[in-house]
Amino acid sequence: MLPQNKDQVLPQTSVLPGCPPWGFSQLVDSSPHNLQPLSAHQSLRPSHPPFFSTQSHHPSFSPPASPSPGFQFGSCDPNSDFVPHPCSPSLPSSPTFFHQNYLSLPNPRASSPSNHWLYPSPPLTPSFSPSQPQNSSLPHSPCQSPSHPEDLHSSTLTSPGPSPPSQRLHSNRQTWRWHQYRDTGSGSPGVVERCVPSEKDPAQFRDPGALAQALVVQLGHRRIAHDLRLLLLQHLWLGRTGQAPVVEYPICLVCLRPRSPSCPLPKYRTGPRLLAFPQLLPCVEGQESGPLRIGIGFGLRLPQGQARALHLLPEKRPKEVGPQGKDPQACGHPSPAFQPPAAQARADPAPGTPSQTRSFRSAGLQSPNSPRCFSGPPPRAPKQATTSPKPRPCPAPKRPVSLELILQKSSV
């Protein structure tokens, strides 16, 4: 509590222009343990004007003309405490706060002899003067933020401290927005460009390389090289030597630009992406050894249906058909499952004549008198060789044997 006599706080002598002004450290008790927040419900008496007010470069406030719990650091009421709040959430961010803010007395009447400017001392060092006794009877108050909005206005501008965390979070949020939406190519952070359809249809390229080059121009070679360099250094730092560094950029095939929140949703689950990867360049012709050169290769990752719709895949060749558009097996050619009569005869051989059965098989296909069980031209030797997976060479008979002789021997 302040003494009852006002002369102990501020003498009634006017300050001459040549005399040094009073310091801020002589008016406020600098002990941080003896500080107590100023109550917002306490006001000054109408007969006394406020002691002095502040003018900061952060908020612009005018000194109150009527008694109000505004920016008042002292009062003449003996029931009020002349102590600002030690830890306010609206602290200045600059440590040179006392060099940028000045304290001034209100000027209601020019005839008042005590109206003069007060400049606070830059260092806030603990000092005690005989004009102000040490306030040791005040209870210790914890450093906490005011619970009412009125306390916020009545407890500001105390001592230099660190910048509030709200300003740092706001700056980080702007940086995060800029990194998030910088893919759109906008000049200002946080501004998202609209998805404007491109003048050229992606289906007109008909080449994945040409479409990839058009997307690279919109994205920028310098940015791709920077991102790929960072990814390569990250792989080397983490020891991922087995994985090739590949940078993927989601793209929009409507505006032919990197994808932004304003672009329409892709039709497929995996949207189109532009791939960038390091590529080893060949040496110069005529030089066996030289410096290692690394380039950047590009590719597109598209769903198969979307790539086929954009005519980026080679067309499939139609299957070869016969002259009349029919299956070759319908013309009377034997199929692999078809067995000629010689094969049927081999399936049921005579009990004692295996060699005669083999000769019958070889002679049955070569003799002109053998019966035919299918219509159409006779099968050719090369085509029959293609139908059987592994044709066995038949042993040539030592002498020509007629069909009648073979039948007579088999019946005995």
Curated annotation (Swiss-Prot):
Record Pfam families: DUF4679
Top-rank taxon: Eukaryota
Residue stretches of biased makeup (Low complexity): 126-142, 334-350
Coiled coil: none
Biased composition (Polar residues): 33-45, 353-372
Residue numbers spanned by region Disordered: 33-75, 123-174, 318-412
Stored InterPro entries: DUF4679 (IPR031461)
Record-given protein name: Proline-rich protein 30
Organism: Macaca fascicularis (Crab-eating macaque)
